[in-house]
Design a protein with these regions (language model features):
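Active-/binding-site microenvironments in catalytic and ligand-binding cores
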Residues: 1-216
Length: 216
């Protein structure tokens, strides 16, 4: 049993290096207070987090519209697809056949090794829109896709990234949106988990939240 989420701290990388994280002591026993507590200020799309449909669809689902059963999964598939700086994930990368009953698709690229370097947020890989379209059309059982780089959107190809997010998250009458988990910790996992529990930070009306992920 392991966590597939990174710890959040003041050095957590952010997409485009554009969001500040500030975690500080609100009260501190070392300073004479009766208890310890923290003050936390950050964007909701920080660290290992999930993008929900509302993030790119004005009428999309928000957090509280997903019941508890939508966060526990027994059919999880891990695929290894090494990606370089600014490389775009395409349908052609999926040489390993995906199982038709997969609920969570985890893509391990190895880009996590750059997480404490500028290139992690500035030159990250991205995902082409065709992947979202293809997965939704051919693998209707997939509820979530996750990966070990900072965003579905390559920072150097932002317009394509916006289209890609919509390909996964926008509602249509043919198939359900696929939720997106970005910035996963995958360095300690090499095989398909038997079970995955995704625990979202419960914020009303959220279009995305940090998640704690436990793999069994």
């Amino acid at each position: 049993m392991i966590f597939l989420s990174h710890l959040i701290d003041n050095n957590t990388p952010t997409y485009g290096n554009s969001s500040d994280i500030k975690i500080s002591h609100a009260t501190c026993m070392d300073h004479g207070d009766t208890a310890n507590s923290l003050s936390i200020k950050m964007n909701n799309h920080i660290g290992t987090h999930i993008d929900l449909p509302k993030h790119f669809d004005i009428n999309g689902k928000v957090l509280e519209q997903y019941p508890a059963c939508e966060w526990v999964f027994n059919k999880v598939q891990l695929v290894n697809i090494p990606l370089e700086e600014e490389e775009m994930l395409s349908v052609s990368h999926f040489k390993k056949k995906l199982r038709e009953d997969t609920e969570v698709l985890i893509i391990k690229t190895g880009f996590e090794k750059f997480r404490h370097q500028e290139s992690y947020w500035k030159n990250n890989p991205g995902v082409l829109p065709e992947v979202g379209t293809w997965l939704r059309k051919n693998f209707g059982s997939i509820k979530i896709i996750g990966f070990d780089f900072i965003s579905l959107t390559c920072f150097q190809r932002r317009e394509i990234g916006r289209i890609s997010h919509r390909a996964f998250l926008e509602s249509n009458k043919n198939n359900e949106p696929i939720r997106i988990i970005e910035d996963m910790k995958l360095s300690e996992i090499d095989t398909d988990p038997k079970k995955l529990i995704v625990l979202p930070l419960m914020i009303k009306g959220a279009d995305g939240v940090p998640v704690s992920i436990i793999a069994f």
